[in-house]
Every structure is written in structure tokens, then in C-alpha cells.
């Protein structure tokens, strides 16, 4: 019963704090020890942002530490919220702000952090930059993406990215293409397409659906492996894969286990976003210092590939090459050590 009461209390606090910044009134603001500045339009993506929120939620359930979430509409509003938080917490003890993704890296470089309170900190997630006044932590995608590319070598492949010139996405693209180019079958090719030229690409599921549906319809036998780096737009790709007929293509689940969203997901690239944030918050609560910058990777379990037995149970299409339920397990076992080694090489260069 006590746990249920705690859960309800936290849910009420989160609900009260999910409004615009102007609605954070004194009672909640003064109580909050942890503040999470979410990526614009990020929550509800069935992926990265939801996983991060779950990690923070598990921390507050365990510790009953007050929390609030700020969800800006765009990066301009995010900077206003960030500046206000720094002002409000300049002299407070034990106040933590988590900047939810590398989208905020330029803002973090531009806006100086001045916190005088004991134990107060700012964490920028998904960045390896060294920035005065705050800590950064990143999960490397290179090795896991390399493994996805190597396991996709029997297909033509499509890498669909939300935006151009994003360091985190570029790392995934490089990893996937390196693995694919090293192991693809003769005559198979990979292509990289972009959904948008700016950050709007993270939240364009309808555009992703139309792009994917047109691509499937343009081929009498669509057989591509899709590697989606789309954030909230990813749901559009999954929906198109479910809706379109004569589709023998597959899609790799992204960030979390997405096998329940489509029977066309043979495996997912899992990023332990929530666990990393949970562990950082536990370290903060215990008084342990955060390193200035830290990168986690496959060798530490921060990124991994999850194979989905449900793919074989639910796949009713005549996909003869998938009749052996060990198809992707064999590919995984063949390339996993190579992927870990390639990631170490990448990080050391």
C-alpha cells in the first residue's frame, strides 16, 4: 500500500508539472529536487524519450525524490526554461537539472552555469562534450549500429534519419554503414535518406508514414531492412510497415524493444537510456561526484541488440529465408565480437 501511495503521489506531481513553464507555481517549484528538461515534443515517442522518463520515474519511486518535467514546444522555449531554472536554483542545495539530449548542447555551451548551492548539478545527456559547469554522458551507438548493419547484409538497406548533421545520428549512420559495407551480399546496397533539414524531423510521424508507404508501393516486392533514426517519427515507419500489402521488408526496433508495435521487427537496438539516468541520479543522491564527461558503450551493456522470438511466432508472410528461427541469432553470434572491437577502435581514434 505504501508503494501504491508513493506512486500515486509521484504521478500527481508529474501531472501537475507537465504544463507550460508559467504554470509551475510555488508549491511544486520549491519542492522539486530533480528537473528533467525533455527534448521538444519528445514524450510519447515509444522510444528514447519515454525510456529516459521511465528511468527517472523508477528513481523517484525508489527514493521518493520530488521531480518535475519541463516539456518545451521548441528549443527557444527550452532555453527560456533553462535560464529560469539556473536563476531560481543559483543558491539552492541539491538541485539537479537533466538536459534531455544533445539537442541542447549548443544551448549548454552558450548559457553559463553558475550554481553556488551544495550538491547542485546540471547533466547534459547524449553528449560527450566538455562544458564548464556541467557534466555530460553519452551512450555510444557506433558498435550496436555496426552490428545492425552487419546483420542486415542480406538485404538492401534503408537508413532513415530524422535530421542532417546531428552528431549522435551521424555516429549511428557511420556505424551501420561500416558494418553493412563490410558484410553485405553481392548486389545489395544501402541508402541514407533524411526526413527533414531541421529538428522538426523528430516529430513528423505522418511524413515518415507517407515516405515509407510510397517506397513500399513503388516496388512489387519490397524487401529492404529499415534502420530508423527518427525519434517520435519512428511510429510512422512502423505503421506503414504494418499497413502496406506485398511488403517483405523488415524494420529494426530503435532505442527500446519495439517488437510489440509490428510483426516486421526481428530485433531491436536497445539503448539503456533510463538505466543510465537512474544510476546517475542514485550517485548524486549518495553524494558521489559525476565525471566531467563519460561515454558508455556495448562492452558496458549500455547498448545492445535484443532478438525477438515473437518475430517468428507472428510472422505470417511467406518469408522463406526466415523459416529457420535461428537466422538472426546466428548473424548476431557471428558479428558481435567484431562489433565490440570496431566500437573500441572508433572511440580510440
What are these regions (language model features)?
Residues 92-102, 125, 159, 220-231, ...:
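Periplasmic-binding protein-like
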Residues 116-139, 256-262:
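Flexible loop/hinge segments that line or gate small-molecule binding clefts
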Residues 56, 146-192, 293-317:
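An alpha-beta-alpha
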Residues 14-16:
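C-terminal motif of bacterial Sec signal peptides marking the signal peptidase cleavage site
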Residues 33-54, 59, 70-75, 102, ...:
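Extracytoplasmic "Venus flytrap"
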Residues 137-157, 270-286:
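Hydrophobic alpha-helical segments within soluble ligand-binding/sensing domains
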Residues 170-222:
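Extracellular/periplasmic Venus flytrap/periplasmic-binding protein
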Residues 279-349:
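Hinge/cleft segment of the Venus flytrap/periplasmic-binding protein
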Amino acid at each position: 500500500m505504501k508503494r501504491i501511495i508513493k506512486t500515486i503521489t509521484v504521478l500527481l506531481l508529474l501531472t501537475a508539472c507537465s504544463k507550460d513553464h508559467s504554470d509551475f507555481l510555488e508549491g511544486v517549484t520549491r519542492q522539486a529536487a530533480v528537473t528533467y528538461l525533455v527534448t521538444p515534443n519528445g514524450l510519447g515517442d515509444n522510444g528514447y524519450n519515454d525510456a529516459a522518463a521511465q528511468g527517472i520515474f523508477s528513481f523517484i519511486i525508489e527514493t521518493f525524490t520530488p521531480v518535475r518535467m519541463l516539456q518545451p514546444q521548441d528549443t527557444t522555449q527550452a532555453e527560456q526554461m533553462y535560464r529560469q531554472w539556473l536563476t531560481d536554483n543559483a543558491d539552492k542545495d541539491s538541485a539537479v537539472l537533466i538536459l534531455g539530449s544533445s539537442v541542447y548542447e549548443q544551448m549548454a555551451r552558450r548559457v553559463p552555469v553558475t550554481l553556488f548551492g551544495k550538491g547542485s548539478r546540471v547533466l547534459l545527456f547524449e553528449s560527450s562534450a566538455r562544458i564548464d559547469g556541467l557534466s555530460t554522458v553519452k551512450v555510444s551507438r557506433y558498435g550496436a549500429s555496426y552490428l545492425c548493419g552487419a546483420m542486415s547484409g542480406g538485404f538492401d538497406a534503408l537508413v532513415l534519419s530524422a535530421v542532417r548533421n546531428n552528431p549522435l545520428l551521424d555516429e549511428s549512420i557511420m556505424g551501420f554503414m561500416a558494418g553493412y559495407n563490410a558484410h553485405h551480399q553481392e548486389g545489395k546496397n544501402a541508402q541514407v535518406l533524411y526526413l527533414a533539414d531541421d529538428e522538426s524531423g523528430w516529430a513528423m510521424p505522418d511524413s515518415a508514414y507517407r515516405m515509407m508507404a510510397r517506397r513500399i508501393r513503388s516496388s512489387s516486392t519490397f524487401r529492404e531492412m529499415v534502420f530508423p533514426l527518427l525519434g517520435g517519427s519512428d511510429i510512422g515507419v512502423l505503421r506503414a510497415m504494418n499497413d502496406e500489402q506485398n511488403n517483405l521488408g523488415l524494420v529494426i526496433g530503435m532505442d527500446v524493444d519495439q517488437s510489440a508495435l509490428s510483426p516486421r521487427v526481428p530485433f531491436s537496438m536497445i539503448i539503456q537510456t533510463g538505466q543510465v539516468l537512474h544510476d546517475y541520479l542514485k550517485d548524486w543522491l549518495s553524494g558521489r561526484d559525476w565525471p566531467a564527461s563519460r561515454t558508455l558503450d556495448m562492452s558496458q551493456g549500455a547498448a545492445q541488440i535484443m532478438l525477438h522470438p515473437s518475430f517468428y511466432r507472428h510472422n505470417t508472410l511467406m518469408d522463406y529465408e526466415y523459416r529457420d528461427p535461428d537466422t538472426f541469432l546466428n548473424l548476431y553470434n557471428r558479428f558481435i565480437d567484431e562489433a565490440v572491437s570496431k566500437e573500441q577502435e572508433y572511440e580510440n581514434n
